[in-house]
């Protein structure tokens, strides 16, 4: 038997696909799926059932229909890509500048679900190639809802990882403004005012909008932000290359040259020059860029834009209490909840854990209050953007539950700048760049 005959043999094909299928079932951990071997056996060996019922059977010499061939190819592509999206990789586009210098607005990524293990779909009835919306309507049905379960991956979330996750506050959204934080609007405007803004949608965990941030604290860590810098368990965090902050830049009355600004990697259209300062009230800079700006001949002074008055931000900064004394730059210390750990519930720490108990762990708050303690059902993480003064992150909405973790950015396959025209809009230097 030649190699070509061996590869084309029906038993060879059956054994190959059967072994792959069994490996997938073992990974999935649900052995009821082994009954699928009957289907594979029939496809390649017995051929009793016409599984590709949509495909026309042609008589010898009959001309093949191009439409039928295209339909066959499309059905295969939909099944194959959906399988890849669920278990291996998923495309994701960076929507904001919160990770600027590390990940840019307009970066198109492949997110590896194998990094931490893929989640088994909790909302399986979903239109292929959509996440949560199509034409302004839900692209999924909640008729079938599964419990959270994660398959084994290559590892676990580590401190410093860039992580894609479901937005924790995205369980409730306004249909007309799905990108807005509904819970923040309720705190600031009041529930009655928000109710007047239109219909709300309740989304399952796996249908929340995706965010990407850097994991700065793991379950069991104690986090504190002092003068904008993160400290974990008393140790200052690693200074990542893309880390940047907002600075107040005072000049001698002359603007910084546009070419100099562009050379720094800053879009001049995003800078505001205040003649009364004179200078720039908010310039976003990395430590390297900061040194270059300070060295410019027309720059007199550069100072940090720290938020120091907690009274001004109590409705914006987690845990949204008047007496926390926290701002985006002076935050904590805060202990990150860990699965299986029991904490005593007090009047002081209840605002920290109330949403965990009711929304993420789906437990009974009154029962926990009566017991005076609570045991966490899953791990939690603290995420922050590298653009620390232009990032809505865990400082503004709290902890990220483990069941919200989607994966880790793996590859930038395309990057475009919306502020430029094609072909200059394509950032070629970021093409096929590993994250």
Regions picked out by a protein language model, each given a short descriptive name:
Residues 1-435:
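Extended hydrophobic leader/signal-anchor segments used for secretion and membrane insertion
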